[in-house]
Amino acid sequence: MKLKKFLVLLLIPFLYACSSDRSGNYDDAFAKDTNGLDLLTGQFSQNIDQIWGVNELLVASRKDYVKYTDSYYTRSHISFEEGQITIETLADANRLHSAIVHTLLMGSDAKGIDLFASGDVPISSRPFLVGQVVDNFGRQINNIDVANSFASYLLQNRLQSRRLSNGRTVQFVSIQMIANHVNVRARKYLSLVRQASRRYGIDESLILGIMQTESSFNPYAISYANAMGLMQVVPHTAGRDIFKLKGRSGQPSKSYLFDPANNIDAGVSYLWILKNEYLAGITNPTSMRYAMISAYNSGAGAVLRVFDSDQEYAINIINRMQPEQVYRILTTVHPSSQARNYLLKVDKAQRSYRRAR
């Protein structure tokens, strides 16, 4: 029951983001739509409970693509972190075959796919998963013929089943992505990363490290905090700062942030804001980088409060420390365990992209 309640709470911002492209005041819109949103959330959860059973609710997240089809009787799940694709159905094998094909050939335009609706995902002439998955012959799956052939192979040779708590039987197939699937996705966005790096003076490896940590280069990424896209920009907080920097009012919409070019530009411009406004005064470049990474996750105020409640004095303390000391404090003393781990993960990822140059 606790798990179910947590997932329903997680669904609230997800459903709001997927059911609205409004770019007005988030807080007002959210408050006004509370009753309708509660109804929508409850209906979705109830549908999944009735069809799949208790504790089978699965929704999209930062590093997981989840799409229901066939009136929620079929679903596709891509774990971009683990490199695993699972497609399962409570319907017949024909529906599973169709879901396999549509998943393998889906495009990269997150704006064009409603993750909350239960319709089929459009087949794209430029599938997003090309280069990340191969068929049983080792071929790239880039057209309908190869996808159909591979789907037939999977159903004939790798079909599995499991029993749900409600007594229903699920048929499913699992597909392992290639070993370097993360790097394949990263390369898709290199040109956009380089443009943003030059525009804002932020190191490419830092941008890539943050993208990997935030979304594992999942263009459909959305979180319980309503963060969206590759760099997980929250519209009503960082989004407002970003628009203010650009001389625009309001906040970015869902469709704006699900555009990879806009999302990367937004995320990198926020790094610029952290560096040149909120954390301005930190003199050591390495200490600044550590502070920026931690602040991207937890906010600049939270980072500075680790050192002192007075922001100016906190910056002076940081400047008297060696970068290694700043790193150690942010990864051990920061009150948020998520923020502590975040700096560790981004720093490790950034180092790997530096070596890859």
Curated annotation (Swiss-Prot):
Pfam families: Mltc_N, SLT. GO terms for biological process: cell wall macromolecule catabolic process; cell wall organization; peptidoglycan metabolic process. Keywords: Cell outer membrane, Cell wall biogenesis/degradation, Lipoprotein, Lyase, Membrane, Palmitate, Signal. It is found in: Cell outer membrane. CDD domains: LT_MltC_MltE. GO terms for molecular function: hydrolase activity, acting on glycosyl bonds; peptidoglycan lytic transglycosylase activity. Residues 1-17 form the signal peptide. It comes from the Bacteria. It catalyses: Exolytic cleavage of the (1->4)-beta-glycosidic linkage between N-acetylmuramic acid (MurNAc) and N-acetylglucosamine (GlcNAc) residues in peptidoglycan, from either the reducing or the non-reducing ends of the peptidoglycan chains, with concomitant formation of a 1,6-anhydrobond in the MurNAc residue. Belongs to the transglycosylase Slt family. HAMAP family: MltC. This is Membrane-bound lytic murein transglycosylase C. It comes from Mannheimia succiniciproducens (strain KCTC 0769BP / MBEL55E).
